[in-house]
Amino acid sequence: MKFHIGVFLLALAAGSLACAPASNDTAETAPEAEPVREVLTADMQAALTPEQVFEQLKAGNQRFVDGQLTRRDYNAQAAATAAGQYPKAAVLGCVDSRVPPEIIFDQGIGDLFVGRVAGNFENEDLLGSLEFATAVAGTPLIVVLGHTSCGAIKGAVAGVELGNLTAMLDNFDEVLAQVREIQALGTTDPEEAAVIQAAIEENVRRTMNDILERSSVISELVQSGDLAVVGGVYDLATGLVTWMES
């Protein structure tokens, strides 16, 4: 009896193998796209309009959200940009580790100038950097990029005091005052979502306006049509950038 059971089990196993689908090793698969090695050149940058770059960043962010990031040969791009750079956009963003501009906009080496400070506000140093990026290096678009649940804004709402952080958070006093005036919100609760989100958005708008007011170099480029300044807020949960009107 044991012999017959053993023969039956062997036959059953053999039948199962015969009916099993072909392994992945033999299945046909679509060829994987070659990684991008090319970088922006001076001629390519010069041909870009602010509107075209804006659309490219929107499309790149959507690829990021969809999990369809472009494959890139970063070693090749690093070598290709060693002698010069011709970025398409300059991003003024927050230092938050969860908001890397090159990744969330699906851009490669040499595509973006990036200046970062907690709370993505402008100061003399960052204005000078943006003037270099635009007037000297030819970048046609400036992006002011905030993000949800910004720790700097939360700290300002809570009135945090800590070393040099205290002076930095003072940059948001006018933003918070305007938000509370508009929304008639008197709370100082750092977890008050309405205050925090409104302040994040207002801070982006104010930074955009301050860049134009404080830099004649940049404002003249905007007036001539060679440059645009846009702003958006990145959602930490979804990865999507919501663009704002100035």
Regions of interest found by a model, annotated:
Residues V144:
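Conserved functional hotspot residues or short segments at active or partner-binding sites
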Residues M1-F8:
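Bacterial N-terminal signal peptides that target proteins for export
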Residues P101:
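Acidic/His- and Gly-rich active-site-bordering loop/insert found
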